[in-house]
């Protein structure tokens, strides 16, 4: 915020005086309808904005609610209203949709007209109070970057929107508009959305979170009302964001979208017939998961937390779910627990075997011997202690499955991100797999290493036959699959777990390694598309590897014995490690 402070230097004779100017005033305009599920987070992030609240005024309107939106807004304002320069909150308490609406997500002309009237009222209110800026923002936007408002003001642009991220291709700007005023696909859209080109970009449309400078004379011509446009020029729909965009166009005022920073997140508006308890709550889970991935936590003020219900937890119809995590990686564990709370997953933390606690002697004493001739395909090195610990962690789970007679288990690592609609998609994958039968393992997340297409499983829309793959981010394994993996006594001919699995389903390119394993009958499938991806890739900021960045084993000297007959029993006795939305050409909306 210090970067925004303006200083004026006055020189009088030999004296020089520096004076500090106050920051511009901003009126924040919000329309609220049926947003009880988003408001606790929306208000928390709005409150977190690093901008002087005594330079901000709030203008909030709400009507036709069927939830606790008004109650939540009142609760937040009760605590915060005194912090802001002024608060203007009006609402209609009668519940239910308009008589002309088919559903609460139906956008008809009456609804558009009401929103147009309210936004025009907000614009006029900002002008009447001589605000320097008006910031229109929807109640399902989460401005996770606390510097958003200040950074936008620094741009000194007449109309600017912070680019917002959704759980798909949807965002709050258009790069093209058709002759009949609707969304047009362009090559530039994805370049901006994917940060392939970064900066401030002139576009024909911004919406959902828009900052307007009221000190620019031409902005007096901006309007949401069709009647205020030049006579005879507009023949488009009754739609607030389109009319506003065209009023800017007719007035010669450029609109910009700014993607120089990650500013925040946006919900995709519901289509007519879609519901808040269904689709929108799933979308909220997706977006909140994105935020947890990026920041490690959510902003939720204590007085608003009572409006957020706990998500009931289950095991996705499986016998058990395990998360492998090193005890010392508390930040990963904390992040994953937040994901499980959001997704409603009942998961047991399974302490990983820590490679840092292993030594050549410990490994040898545990009965572990290494596959003759093994070297990492990329780094041409023997196994690291981290890779040994990783294998033992998975191995211990397979042993526990057999001991406890667990029929189907999901094994998760702790450096994963969940794809949108994870629960629904996971249930779909599992339903297909059980209906078809004949599988031992299903990858939920992996790195595919073969270029050729993988064959679809007959009768399934979600499953393919797994080819040579790396990573064990997440997989479902059956009891029979665990028994197959244990029967080969892999600790007597050890190699990394993500090499062992493809060998066991007989799809590994190294015939020399494969020849050491006889019963390669593991039936392995993969979800398609995948349900899990890594949080970071090699080289990314924040990337940490507990397998690569660890000591390597001492390569055995010629003549050393490579196998012990009872490696699993010795290990057990050691006690170590136990215990996408796309864009539509029609206008999609979310306000009142």
Curated annotation (Swiss-Prot):
The protein's Enzyme Commission number: 2.-.-.-
Region Disordered, annotated ranges: 552-592
Chain location of the short sequence motif Prevents secretion from ER per the record: 589-592
Gene3D superfamilies: Spore Coat Polysaccharide Biosynthesis Protein SpsA, Chain A (3.90.550.10)
Repressor in keyword set: no
InterPro entries documented for this protein: Collagen_mod_GT25, Glyco_trans_25, Nucleotide-diphossugar_trans
GO cellular component labels: endoplasmic reticulum lumen
Keywords: Endoplasmic reticulum, Glycoprotein, Glycosyltransferase, Signal, Transferase
Pfam family, one: Glyco_tranf_2_4
Subcellular location: Endoplasmic reticulum lumen
Name of the protein: Glycosyltransferase 25 family member
Protein source organism: Anopheles gambiae
